Amino acid sequence: RAGDLILQTCLLPPREKPYDLALELARHRMKTYIHKCEDWLMFNPGFAPFAAEHFERARDAFTEALVAPDLDAEGLLAASAIDLGMQATDELAMAHADILLHRRYGKKTASSTTLGTIIDPRTDPALIGPTLEAFDLVTVPMRWREVESKRGKYDFTALDRWLTWAHDTGKPIIAGPLVDFSPGALPDWAEVFRFDYASLRDPLYDYLEQVVTRYIKHVGMWKISAGLHLCRGGPRPITEVIDAIRTAELLIRRHKRTARRMIEVHDLFGDTTARVSGSIGAFEFLERLGAEGLRFDSIGARLIVGGTEPGTRSRDLMTLSDSLDRFFGDEHPLLLSACGAPCRDLGEGAGRWGEAWTPDRQASWAAKVIPMALSKPYVEAICWSAHTDNATPDPGGESGFGIVEEDGTPRPAFARLVSMRRRLRRPLGPWVPPGAHPPAQAGDASGRSDE
């Protein structure tokens, strides 16, 4: 019932006898439920009665699996414990989100820059613009490859068109990333310098100077970098990464000291770090930037599921909530600068959340995860990862995260997002324990749906 998801075990000491994978996955799920109940002060069954019921059943199945007479019985009981445990942890995560969401927005409305989306600069504002009216802000990707396809020849046609549209409509803009070394980000003529930073640094600076000078008065927040810590374009010394970020940061401050700056991190789960040489974890990277004295106003986090790239594969709601909890206590506000799920299956390894990915399943995921994220008091805003499919294609080779078709036709997730944003334009009122709620409409801002 949970789908095809990435799960984990507890840290296991080496031993001669092989571990039973299903049993250890169930053990970790039991541990996660207990740990988060303690962390969130959710031990009272009245806060999440369905979660408590499923946990008790999962614990009984796990206990029986530990003393099962044979491996077949153990496997069946462990599988049942995993299934029930997944239900329990997801229900706990959503119950906790419901409480915090009402605590945060019970007496006040959400800010005027709560919900955004990422557009594809190659699309036509006249066609896509009307579908952006319900969103508070817009992220405009800036790709060096498209702006300077020939060295020294800059083409700002697409960016000018969208920045003009944003100015005319009064939409706040997040622009960037300015520094991006991922595959396909560099112009063809600059690829020969990919691993020669001394030669790449000057043309990179020239590009940054052109972009920042042109748009400094029109951009509300600059996304300086996105996922540089993962070294997806090949190994790169951290000193070069820091130098590139510092160059962009100082250039922005030189033109406008009050300009807001953001650093975006990818793969909060550490999948890429374990696979790609030279990569470091998102949280370690942020600590390193702080130690180097780099200044930025916000942290951006990419939270993608259903993709084929490590760090974007399907995961359960509790894992997503727990990953966001790791930002608690950071002095910088958090933006979910790219949050999304696909509307179709993207291939082997992408997984699925319950049923296969479809437009309706994408909408159901959004109705759960967006309220869950906004319930975190340190989350400042959320941007959907792709307004149309080609805005931020899955690095694994496919695209399908859009909430609007290329011709401007909305998908079901679009309606869910607009409905949630509309709901947060007025106070939610006090939280009422489960069982005392009147029937809720599907996909309301509190995260309850007919799912």
Model-based region annotation:
Residues 137-150, 160-270, 341-343:
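Substrate-binding cleft and catalytic face of glycoside hydrolase catalytic domains
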Residues 115-119, 224, 245-280, 332-345, ...:
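Aromatic-lined carbohydrate-recognition surfaces of secreted/lumenal glycan-active proteins
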Residues 267-300, 392-393:
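Substrate-binding cleft/loops of secretory-pathway carbohydrate-active enzymes
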